[in-house]
Structures are given as structure tokens and as C-alpha cells.
Amino acid sequence: MQTRNTFSCIKKQITRSISVSLMLYIITRTSIASAYPIFAQQGFENPREATGRIVCANCHLANKPVDIEVPQAVLPDTVFEAVVRIPYDMQLKQVLSNGKKGGLNVGAVLILPEGFELAPPDRLSTEMKEKIGNLSFQSYRPNKKNILVVGPVPGKKYSEITFPILSPDPATKKDARFLKYPIYVGGNRGRGQIYPDGSKSNNTVYNATAAGIVSKIIRKEKGGYEITITDASDSRQVVDIIPPGPELLVSEGESIKFDQPLTSNPNVGGFGQGDAEIVLQDPLRVQGLLFFLASVILAQIFLVLKKKQFEKVQLAEMNF
């Protein structure tokens, strides 16, 4: 009887431990999933400034290319692809937050005209779903469905990102018009150099905050350095903290100037922006164009037939 009770207690403890572990796993996964904030969303109501500059450039300081491809024209209530290409050398490795080297991630922001939005899953073709893969798109703001963000995602797999877009229908959306519209895109590869609060990441160069002699360099246990700079005139000391990642360029006893680089610049990524144009085409206008072309072709045919008939009449009169 005692053995049975002991077994029952052990069973309850194991069940409880599994339940707690499962809860911790779910909580941890949730926090990890939400630990990739799109920094621009936190600090800016609109990602594109009045000057045309996309705010992602505030954190990603290096300038790199980005390309966007969209159809020249689309019909109302139609799903189409906006393909964003973020090219880079796949052999490159970036400095991670812990100072180690790893693959580059990519991200993009797509600014569509008002009324254009992410296409619902039930409107996507099988081919389009394959192109999208496991990408998860989200609106920049709940009230800004025309601005889409994605990332960070692995660059080796998603250096080309396909956005599924649904065009508006002016018949149901009064604000939509049959016009030519601009589309803006921003894309980054790799980590940024500056955080939104203005502090530096470990993916950038660190400069001396004072002039003097490098009197001491301490290598930290978890990586990084503490560099003590002593002013030769008054012996005042300044300590510069270097996080893990950048390579040190100075040594003890070296004389340095203010703002002189203490480390190399480990950044291999960068940000770029571009634009394209798309026409929301009126179906009646297309039908009118087709009708006009058909009329021209028919007129040409009748003209040729009339000419041949006239030639036959002339030939008959000559023979008569």
C-alpha cells in the first residue's frame, strides 16, 4: 500500500514538472518571438520622413543597394507580387550580439499607396505561397495596412522577398482612384550600428573619447576590452569600454588622439532604399482600348476588301 502511494506521489510530481516545463517553454518561446522588434515601429509614426528618407537608415549607417519589381499596371481587386531583392555576398559573416560571427539577417519595409494592402491567404495561388515560404508579414501600424514590414529573417534564404499585395477597388473604396502611384521600399542586410536610444551596438567602430596615452588594456572574461587612456598633461584617466566583436587596433603605451578609432569596423551589412511606380488601371479603359484596336483592325480589313473590289470593277470595265 505504501509503495503504491509512493508511486502515485512520484507520478504526480512528474506530471507537475512536465506541466511547469511546458508552461515555461511556451512563455520563453513567446518572449523570444517578441524579442525581435522592428525598431522603426517603436519610435516613428511613419517610416518615411518628409525628405523621402526611410528611418531605418538611422540605425543602419552603411549604404547598400536594394531593388523592387512590381507590375507596370494592375486591375482593381487583384493580387500581384512586389518582389524586393536585397543582394549581398553570401560568404560574409557578421558580428552577433555576443561577439561571435554568424550569418547575416535581412529585413524590409514596403510603403504602398493608400488602399493597397497585404493579400489575404485565401487569395494566394499555390505558386505564390511557395515563393513566400514561411515569411510572416505585418502592418507597420494597425491603422496603416498599406505599410508592411518583415524580418529579421535569414539572408541566405530570403535575400529575395515576395510581398503578396491586393489592389483596391474604387467601386468599394471611395478613396481609391485610377491613377499612377509611387511605391517605396527599404531593405537592410545585417545588424545595425546604432540602437534607437542612440547607444552603439557592437557592430560598429569605437573611437577614443579622449586624447592621451593608452596606459592599460584589460581583456574581459566574456570578451571585449576596458581601455584606460591617461592624459599626459594632468594624469586624468578615461576608461573606454569596448564590447565583444570589434577588433582592437591600439596597444598599451601608444599615443592616441581624440576620436581616433580604437577598433576596426566589423560591419559588413547596410541599408538601401528604392522606389517604383504602378498604375491602378480602369477595366473600362482597357475594354475601350481593346474595342478601339479591334475597330482599327476591322477598318483595315474592310479597306483592303474595298480596294480589291474596286480593282475588280476597274478590270471589268477595261475588258468591256
Curated annotation (Swiss-Prot):
Chain sites annotated for binding heme:
36, 56, 59-60
Identify a single GO molecular function assigned to this protein: electron transfer activity
According to its UniProt entry, the protein's GO biological process terms are:
photosynthesis
| Superkingdom classification of source | Eukaryota
Primary localization class, coarse: plastid
Alphabetical list of InterPro entries matching this protein: Cyt-f_TM (IPR024058), Cyt_f (IPR002325), Cyt_f_lg_dom (IPR024094), Cyt_f_lg_dom_sf (IPR036826), Rudment_hybrid_motif (IPR011054)
Q: Which GO terms describe its cellular component?
A: chloroplast thylakoid membrane
What does this protein's record comment on cofactor binding? Answer: Binds 1 heme group covalently.
Q: Where are the transmembrane segments?
A: 286-306
Is Plastid one of the keywords UniProt gives this record? yes
Which keywords annotate this record? Answer: Chloroplast, Electron transport, Heme, Iron, Membrane, Metal-binding, Photosynthesis, Plastid, Signal, Thylakoid, Transmembrane, Transmembrane helix, Transport
Tell where it localizes. Answer: Plastid, Chloroplast thylakoid membrane
Q: How does it sit in the membrane?
A: Single-pass membrane protein
What does this protein need as cofactor?
Answer: heme
User: What is the annotated quaternary arrangement, including any partners?
Assistant: The 4 large subunits of the cytochrome b6-f complex are cytochrome b6, subunit IV (17 kDa polypeptide, petD), cytochrome f and the Rieske protein, while the 4 small subunits are PetG, PetL, PetM and PetN. The complex functions as a dimer.
Name of the protein described by the UniProt record:
Cytochrome f
The protein's organism comes out as Ipomoea purpurea
Organism lineage string: Eukaryota, Viridiplantae, Streptophyta, Embryophyta, Tracheophyta
